[in-house]
Amino acid sequence: MNKILLSTATAFILSLTACSSHAPEKRVHRILTDRIQTLAVAESCTGGTIAARFTALPGASAYFKCGVVAYSLDTKQEILQISCDTIARYGAVSEQVVRQMAEGVRRASNSHYAVATTGIAGPTGGTPEYPVGSVWIAVSTPLRTTTRLIRAGGSRNAVIRKAGTAAIELLEEEL
């Protein structure tokens, strides 16, 4: 009997920790909704994954202003106003570019917060400095912009998923 209870209790606890209600986007959703604050995203290597995770939640229109998938250099320059000099000097996958992406989309959308990603999802395109799975993420707030480099392993889809989660978790930290 005790083994059955323990097994049932363990299964229940595991189901709670795996439950999608614990996803970071749901926690951010609640915080932004409660504070009546807004969010915008600018994504390169994550290709709209972050925007999709937020807009999949009922009530996202209360805080989600826009998502820009800036995959090409032209889009980064024309829509997000990333400096040509910054891209030429540091490259598209850099702390400087992701910072400008987050600040640019926050400014353009007049949002309280913004998240941005740029990186190499793979399976090709890596360099010695930035191997496949290297992703710069940034969160821009009214007070500061925070950046972080992650190294996500696995397949292209795994890199995209991990980078999206890391970006949302960084946003949650900054809230």
Question: Where on the chain are the PLM-derived regions?
Answer:
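Bacterial Sec-dependent signal peptides at the C-terminal "C-region" and cleavage site
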Residues: 8-23
